[in-house]
From Swiss-Prot:
It is a single-pass type III membrane protein. Keywords: Activation of host autophagy by virus, Calcium, Enterotoxin, Glycoprotein, Host endoplasmic reticulum, Host membrane, Host-virus interaction, Ion channel, Ion transport, Membrane, Metal-binding, Secreted, Signal-anchor, Toxin, Transmembrane, Transmembrane helix, Transport, Viral ion channel, Virulence. Homotetramer. Interacts with the immature particle in the viroplasm. Interacts with host CAV1, early and late in infection. Interacts with host integrin ITGA1/ITGB1 heterodimer. Interacts with host integrin ITGA2/ITGB1 heterodimer. Interaction with microtubules blocks trafficking to the Golgi apparatus. Ca(2+) binds at E120, Q123. It comes from the Viruses. Plays an essential role in the virus replication cycle by acting as a viroporin. Creates a pore in the host endoplasmic reticulum and as a consequence releases Ca(2+) in the cytoplasm of infected cell. In turn, high levels of cytoplasmic calcium trigger membrane trafficking and transport of viral ER-associated proteins to viroplasms, sites of viral genome replication and immature particle assembly. The secreted form acts as an enterotoxin that causes phospholipase C-dependent elevation of the intracellular calcium concentration in host intestinal mucosa cells. Increased concentration of intracellular calcium disrupts the cytoskeleton and the tight junctions, raising the paracellular permeability. Potentiates chloride ion secretion through a calcium ion-dependent signaling pathway, inducing age-dependent diarrhea. Its main location: host cell. It holds the Pfam family Rota_NSP4. Binds 1 calcium ion per tetramer. This is Non-structural glycoprotein 4. One of its GO terms (cellular component) is membrane. Residues 1-28 are lumenal. One of its GO terms (biological process) is viral process.
Amino acid sequence: MDKLADLNYTLSVITLMNDTLHSIIQDPGMAYFPYIASVLTVLFTLHKASIPTMKIALKTSKCSYKVIKYCIVTIINTLLKLAGYKEQVTTKDEIEQQMDRIVKEMRRQLEMIDKLTTREIEQVELLKRIHDNLITRSVDVIDMSKEFNQKNIKTLDEWESGKNPYEPSEVTASM
């Protein structure tokens, strides 16, 4: 842990890596050198940061397998992000949670589709009944005896007072 916080140690390791790369690659003006140095620096930093963190996590945690798995997945995801990939590595637990969420969403959508289908079937049946009621049927002779307005017709002689009760009469209003 002391060496992790020691800036001189970290700088000396970076200088050592740079000197090693310069000795391996004879051409100091090589175009890929800054990228290689950046990757090696990131790997070194991850190495120095992850080992003490994992040691502390393993000592304090009871389930060491999950901690190691989580640390490794986090490190791999960090490396993938640094490399420019948008994909991420997931554990089985995360995959199962996502699958459960997807299955719940699919069930909800299937129930909605079922309700909509039932409503559409009911609407089609209603439209069929309305269409059947609106179809005009040809009738040769119209039976007027069943018409409502033809039942109780009285002539002027059949009225009791001899006057048409529906005829308006004069009304005088006092002022």
